[in-house]
Amino acid sequence: MSRRARALHAALALLCAAAVLSTAAQPDASYFTTVDVFVVSDTPVAAWQVELTERRGAMQIVGIERGDDSTFRDPPYYDRVAMMRSSTDRIVLASFSLSDAAQLQRGKVRVARVHVRMTGTPEPDYEARLVAAGTADGRPIDAQLSLETQTER
């Protein structure tokens, strides 16, 4: 084997070793967080729809829970197929209650908790939009949307 071939083999071996060591030394940049979704209204809320987006495209939704209000017994409706695609930077959630208006909550009500796996970005950039909110008799109401996150690193 010529001197040039040995030098080329040595350089290639060093390059491969450096590549293996650099990938082994990098920690997984993903982490889990939750996004609590609140609807805020002075009027009792019987139905709502929310669109949640992560602007950087680094969000993978891994689960969805119902909120604190017992009148919304089940988790909100959402597109399960989109969630199973494992890279969802946008999801639409919605729920309704058939309870009497007297049983419905008003004020700041947690209506859902979204479990998220974030990848490749230090801080998520969420955007949320309240698409609709309504009363027990189907009238639209003025309401605001609020998000709270908790990181589980």
Language-model regions, residue ranges each:
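Bacterial N-terminal signal peptides that target proteins for export
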Residues: 2-12
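Bacterial N-terminal signal peptides
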Residues: 10-20
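Acidic, low-complexity intrinsically disordered segments
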Residues: 21-153
